[in-house]
């Protein structure tokens, strides 16, 4: 169990290990599909968007040289049709990726499995978990993984839905920019993982797209930032995983209290980043942070730093 207040902050690099595209990859995938009229591009016409408008959107997205579709949409936030199409394309792309079998690839230990090892226990002990995950990703791969793991590990949960949801809720997952939908069947925002059985149904895609938020929509519109602030300011340890440290995302975290608690220890992966970029990250954050090397991915960074250390009573002789 994770019994000390601990926050993991997920970026796109976490989901990449489970088959989801990085920000730039998603942008290129959407522009290619819009140009060639393949699956996602064709689906946008079924969602009611004009072919010529789709083509123009794709051209502007490609030549914008923005780091992500989200960043592009933020620049076009006053153009409602651009925002609607962009969000729909993101939703259609990620619902398709949710259906890929990469989540079930068990040939090697990966991040989700490692986290499950640290949070699992007897049914009555889950209330002791103090782990929270703040994710900048729209996909629900981590929630889906946890649900599968909970039920497979505890058959009792199959017939006790309320107890299952209570246990699951002890590991709080906060989607900064929204998600494709809730995996809780009792939720009004419920959407089955991958949108099965019809992930390219226009109603499914448009419904999922309405739950996606841009930067300017994430500030103070609901209780998300309040929940983030509570977890961030109370955390003894915060670890960034697969996170690119884009200035806008850092500012949002600072708005939610990042750096206010001077006792919090900060760690992070920095896969593919050079030492000079480490200095830039520290300047952006405004405090010191221990960063793993440029060849170290999320799982190994988490294992390298003292983030999930058990308290003494959890250590077996």
Give the positions of each predicted feature.
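Acidic, metal/cofactor-coordinating or nucleic-acid-engaging core segments within structured domains
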Residues: 51, 186-235
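Short N-terminal signal/transit or membrane-insertion segments
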Residues: 11, 101-117, 193-211
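Short, surface-exposed, polar/charged, turn-prone segments marking secondary-structure boundaries
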Residues: 34-38, 160-164, 201-206, 266-268
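Active-site cradle of extracellular carbohydrate-active enzymes
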Residues: 166-196
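Active-site periphery "cap/insert" segments of enzyme catalytic domains
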Residues: 2-9, 18-20, 38-178, 225-234, ...
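Residues at the C-termini of beta-strands that transition into short coil/loop
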Residues: 137, 177-180, 270, 293-295
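Short, conserved catalytic or adaptor-binding loops enriched in Gly and charged residues
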Residues: 162-168, 203-207, 258-260, 282-286
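SIR2/sirtuin-family catalytic core signature
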Residues: 1-18, 23-33, 124, 129-131, ...
